[in-house]
């Protein structure tokens, strides 16, 4: 490789910065990777859910799964459960799990589900055993299984601050990442207009060939220096505020296998279970709900879900955000990753997976020469504009299908707020179920089966392609799911048992190492 782009400089730490440093250092060991971060700028750190992609990312970086689970106070995430999104009734609940539905043509599966259960049983519960496992707070794997493998597909719930610290330690100790704690006060460009060096408050400078902007919503490089514009998406995604709270839990309490998203009159609440606490937050639109009412909704939820907890003794962290993304993510020799690239409500935990996909795309096509920069940037920008459009569509899908009557929910169904691309897909899906042909990218963030779980979980009409009488193969597949559900429910440990046993083993191993 030419030495023209060997010096990679990352500005900003947190999950985005340190994932960038570690993944690029691991995938491109010929690079000289430097991360520059101010020592006194806090990270947002509320995104505590990952997709299954994080397993491959950790393996690539070289972080052991058991070490990650212990160091990051992490637990297993097997999907999301949505309560109250359809009509707000007591039994209004559906799952979007990570494991795909039973392997058979979806039109046949829908026919078998409808015939067998009359649509009284949940769609997800009929087509994947993951729901039986989640309902029982079970882990997706046994301790004896090889790392990063499981009986079911899974990601993680985690402490974002601890993940950043683990990545920083691993990157500097094992991957050769240089860590510079300093305030960036300016940027110098070369004669060709490309970024050339960062100017530090100390008077020093850090030179680079390629730069990654992980400065969060400040967007110091991609926004302030390069002037890349912002595409506002608040016309589609209304929520612009959140209250976040960390609620301690009693030792031995159950740990949920899924993120729980509970709808309220002007937004929704998240609930994420970790071994030592629950991360709970209230997402809302300031157009439809006051901050005081949001705090009351959050307090009422905590009181109802965690008896004995005193929400009045806990101060929520107040967040305001703009929904949207950069018009370009890559300009010249600078790539925006994380919040500097864009932000949308954390309804389906898209933040970390967008970071991972951005870094994968960069590592796969890292520039060797200045002449390649425009073409690589154009290709990257086209791909991630597509990905952002699909994320906006998928999150909007959750609102469009709701039948709730509050003004907020009625506004969400206003056709003027529904992207043309989503409206076209919904029309198509009245004819046939979502398929790979509808979502053509290789690394779709939300695949056809994700669309299916939300559509049929929320009561979308069965498509015209559904057969009037189910075939034998589809019925057999659903019977296999039922049997597999019983088998896994009997064989898998609870999340609490798995994680407590793992932490005890990690503690014992550390003590033995200290003695040795």
Report the location of each language-model feature.
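FAD-binding beta-loop-beta segment adjacent to the flavin cofactor pocket
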Residues: 318-336, 342
């Amino acid at each position: 490789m030419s030495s023209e782009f060997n010096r990679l400089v990352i500005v900003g730490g947190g999950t985005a910065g340190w994932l960038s440093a570690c993944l690029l250092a691991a995938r491109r060991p010929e690079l000289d990777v430097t991360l520059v971060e101010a020592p006194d700028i806090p990270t947002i750190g509320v995104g505590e859910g990952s997709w299954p992609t994080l397993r491959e990312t950790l393996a690539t970086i070289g972080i052991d799964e058991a070490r990650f689970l212990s160091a990051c106070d992490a637990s297993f995430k097997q999907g999301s459960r949505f309560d109250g999104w359809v009509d707000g009734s007591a039994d209004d609940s559906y799952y979007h799990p990570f494991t795909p539905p039973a392997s058979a043509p979806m039109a046949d599966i829908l026919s078998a589900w409808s015939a067998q259960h009359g649509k009284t049983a949940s769609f997800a519960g009929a087509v994947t055993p993951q729901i039986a496992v989640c309902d029982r707070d079970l882990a997706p794997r046994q301790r004896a299984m090889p790392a990063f493998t499981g009986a079911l597909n899974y990601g993680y719930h985690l402490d974002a601050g601890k993940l950043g610290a683990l990545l920083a330690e691993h990157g500097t100790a094992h991957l050769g990442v240089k860590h510079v704690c300093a305030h960036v006060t300016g940027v110098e460009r070369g004669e060709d207009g490309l970024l050339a060096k960062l100017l530090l408050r100390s008077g020093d400078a850090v030179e680079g060939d390629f730069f990654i902007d992980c400065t969060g919503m400040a967007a110091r490089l991609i926004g302030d220096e390069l002037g890349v514009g912002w595409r506002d998406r608040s016309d589609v995604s209304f929520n612009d505020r959140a209250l976040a709270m960390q609620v301690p839990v009693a030792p031995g309490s159950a740990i949920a296998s899924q993120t729980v998203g509970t709808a309220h009159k002007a937004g929704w609440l998240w609930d994420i279970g970790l071994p030592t606490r629950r991360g709970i937050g209230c997402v809302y639109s300031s157009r439809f709900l006051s901050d005081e009412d949001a705090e009351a909704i959050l307090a009422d939820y905590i009181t109802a879900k965690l008896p004995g907890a005193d929400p009045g003794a806990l101060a929520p962290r107040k967040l305001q955000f703009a929904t949207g993304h950069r018009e370009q993510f890559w300009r010249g020799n600078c790539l925006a990753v994380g919040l500097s690239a864009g932000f949308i409500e954390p309804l389906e935990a898209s933040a970390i997976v967008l970071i991972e996909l951005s870094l994968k795309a960069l590592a796969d096509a890292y520039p060797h020469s200045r002449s390649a920069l425009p073409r690589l940037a154009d290709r990257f920008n086209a791909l991630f504009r597509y990905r952002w459009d699909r994320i906006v569509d998928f999150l909007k899908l959750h609102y469009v299908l709701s039948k709730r009557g509050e003004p907020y929910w009625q506004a969400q169904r206003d056709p003027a707020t529904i992207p043309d691309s989503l409206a076209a897909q919904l029309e198509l899906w009245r004819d046939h179920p979502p398929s790979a042909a509808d979502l053509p990218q290789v690394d779709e963030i939300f695949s056809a089966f994700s669309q299916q779980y939300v559509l049929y979980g929320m009561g979308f009409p069965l498509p015209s392609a559904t057969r009037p009488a189910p075939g034998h193969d589809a019925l057999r597949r659903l019977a296999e799911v039922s049997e597999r559900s019983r088998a896994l429910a009997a064989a898998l440990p609870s999340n609490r048992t798995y994680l407590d046993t793992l932490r005890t083993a990690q503690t014992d191993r550390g003590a033995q190492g200290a003695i040795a």
